[in-house]
Amino acid sequence: MRPPGFWSRPPTHPLARILAPVGRIYGGLTADRMDRPGAAPPCPVLCVGNFTLGGAGKTPTALALAGLLRDLGRTPAFLSRGYGGRLSGPVIVDPARHRAEEVGDEPLLLARAATAVVARDRPAGARLCAGSGADVIVMDDGLQNPSLSKSLSLAVIDGGAVIGNGLPFPAGPLRAPLLRQWRHVAGLVLIGEGMAGSGVAAEAEAQGLPVHRARLVPEGGADWAGRRVVAFAGIGRPQKFFETLRALGAEIVAERAFPDHHPYRPRDWAALTALAAREGGDLVTTAKDAVRLPPEARGAVAVLTVALAFDDEAGLRRQLAAALPRA
């Protein structure tokens, strides 16, 4: 879904005030659900979640955590609900066989790095992860899902967006009141800069929680300087992708923003190719969008891949090690 504009306005906005009673009910029920005890998993679970609806950078964070866990001598597997996919699982994702409409876009990216399991039933998915040889599970999303007991939960926030008007859905972007969500996290991952992000980071530090500051860095070594591009993205905050391209020196001659997890149809592809021909630019998108493109589009679009780099990687590695039993 595309976030409504009033979510980023003050909470006194008329629509926010009208929807606030519903938000209090929704947020309260979600918070009550978060407080329930979860089932014991077959191996430790590290949860990468966020406080709000929509994207915040959870998938790059999950990929980065898997790399740090390997540094610690662990064998991680990813567990995802498979948002946007029709398979309920549990199923091990095979990028050569599965499509985004079956397992979701994020699991396809995760499966390139390690075993990735899609399961609506998280305990069943955890058993499949362990059965595949994993000794630690990185759960992509699931902070508000109590079905599994977690050894460590990290909340990811986008420094440029964060919590909007601070109200629970549908009055705002929060999944539950922030005050009740804090008790379920052991640290914060702050991606990028921004006044809003700094405020939430200060709140985390005031509660004694570590704040792991990070940034998305381009991979692949492509030279974007001076390149005329038509940029499109259907992610949580497409503007961040466009800003990254501009920072790399690309000349964006046209941009198109789609809703997060947008399933690209042939008509979308036809419109994009016509736009690129008209503007004289190369089509470019994100890795997450690329797996949702029609088969005929793959190979005809440049992909900007990014990875998450932490300012204090050693500090995060220490927190991960402390949360896990000795191997």
Curated annotation (Swiss-Prot):
EC category: transferase
One Gene Ontology cellular component annotation held by this UniProt entry: plasma membrane
InterPro entries, A to Z: LpxK (IPR003758), P-loop_NTPase (IPR027417)
Single Gene Ontology MF annotation: ATP binding
Statement: the UniProt record of this protein carries the keyword Cytoplasm: no
GO biological process, one term: lipid A biosynthetic process
Binding residues for ATP: T52, L53, G54, G55, A56, G57, K58, T59
Protein function: Transfers the gamma-phosphate of ATP to the 4'-position of a tetraacyldisaccharide 1-phosphate intermediate (termed DS-1-P) to form tetraacyldisaccharide 1,4'-bis-phosphate (lipid IVA).
Family note: Belongs to the LpxK family.
NCBIfam families xrefs: lpxK
HAMAP family from the UniProt entry: LpxK
Annotated protein name in UniProt: Tetraacyldisaccharide 4'-kinase
Top-level taxonomy: Bacteria, Pseudomonadati, Pseudomonadota, Alphaproteobacteria, Hyphomicrobiales
